[in-house]
Amino acid sequence: MSFRTIEWRDNKVIMIDQTRLPAEEVYNEYTDFQSVAQAIRGMVVRGAPAIGIAAAMGVALGAREIIADSFDTFYRQLENVCDVIGRTRPTAVNLFWGLERMKRVALQHKELDLNSIRELLKAEAISIETEDLAICKEIGRHGAALVKEGASILTHCNAGGLATAGYGTALGVIRGAHEAGKGIRVFADETRPWLQGARLTAWELMKDSIPVTLISDNMAGWLMRTGQIDFCVVGADRIAANGDTANKIGTYSVAVLAKENRIPFYVAAPISTLDLKLANGDLIPIEERASEEVTQIKGIQIAPEGVKVRNPAFDVTPARYITGIITEKGVVRGDYERELKALVGQ
């Protein structure tokens, strides 16, 4: 791939600014955890796995900022760093997974001097990024096997290299099928209000010379009804124990339409996106974002001033609409509660 979503370089976090794509390919440098938290909140970096990586790297930066003379003092301040980052995006479980993983590293090495702990935290954050790339390629391999030759694939939002360390989850499946020579083509929903499909998915696929057609969100049902879609695949921000899946707002509509038109609908996500502590999707917290994201596009007002707005960033697709969940360990179908628990236990 010709871009890097996020990396640690010279004790700085480097992230591609996704708010400026596709017009500009700009990389921002971050040297403190507060600025990383703001980048997560402001959608400079987005997509559950990428948010998890950014959170971990933010903790590593925060650890370098802490002044302490004992582990207990250091760890209390590290928890404060994690609390600040943890308040940025409530739905993506990878955020909290990354924070907990970093805290665990500190606790497991509390007998070491603080500089050694800081170095271990940096190494852990880099490992999370490296692991994610390998995980996405495994997801792509498992998912590509499900795609028929010449398939037309619909995807929603952006679950690609920009949403991960690279390669992607849903777009990992698409990349895997493309690399296998299956002659696929992709339809990308524009994905209001942030237009991740138009700005990010189309940009990624065009850079990789994967045939892509951009559609407005309200076209998806008609394309399915007229036989122009063979396969649907999306990413996930959190998957409950029963398979209910939170993903970008509009995913639920796509899933219902797919079932009505007998089109397979798959979710592609790493095991770190599973939240088996939540029995079902009704318990997943849904982030509500600013009204201006709906009433404006790039600062231009497109709705009457003062109109009431709802802007949930995610919806929840019940498991009954999901054909299968593609993970790095394989594809889960049917009894999600039992199968997901078994998968995590492997």
Swiss-Prot record:
Pathway given in the UniProt record: Amino-acid biosynthesis; L-methionine biosynthesis via salvage pathway; L-methionine from S-methyl-5-thio-alpha-D-ribose 1-phosphate: step 1/6
Residues binding substrate: R46, G47, A48, R89, Q196, N247, K248
Enzymatic reactions: 5-(methylsulfanyl)-alpha-D-ribose 1-phosphate = 5-(methylsulfanyl)-D-ribulose 1-phosphate
Site residues, Transition state stabilizer: C157
Alphabetic keyword roster: Amino-acid biosynthesis, Isomerase, Methionine biosynthesis
E.C. designation(s): 5.3.1.23
Entries under InterPro entries matching the protein: IF-2B-related (IPR000649), IF-M1Pi (IPR005251), IF_2B-like_C (IPR042529), Initiation_fac_2B_a/b/d (IPR011559), M1Pi_N (IPR027363), NagB/RpiA_transferase-like (IPR037171)
Enzyme class: isomerase
Domain of life: Bacteria
Residue ranges of coiled coil: none
UniProt cross-references to SUPFAM superfamilies, sorted A to Z: NagB/RpiA/CoA transferase-like
Disulphide bridges, residue numbers: none
Active-site residues per Swiss-Prot or TrEMBL entry: D237
UniProt GO BP: L-methionine salvage from methylthioadenosine
Gene Ontology MF terms in the entry: S-methyl-5-thioribose-1-phosphate isomerase activity
Family assignment from sequence similarity: Belongs to the eIF-2B alpha/beta/delta subunits family. MtnA subfamily.
Record-linked NCBIfam families: eIF-2B_rel, PRK05720.1, salvage_mtnA
Described function: Catalyzes the interconversion of methylthioribose-1-phosphate (MTR-1-P) into methylthioribulose-1-phosphate (MTRu-1-P).
Protein name per its UniProtKB record: Methylthioribose-1-phosphate isomerase
Protein species of origin: Geobacter sp. (strain M21)
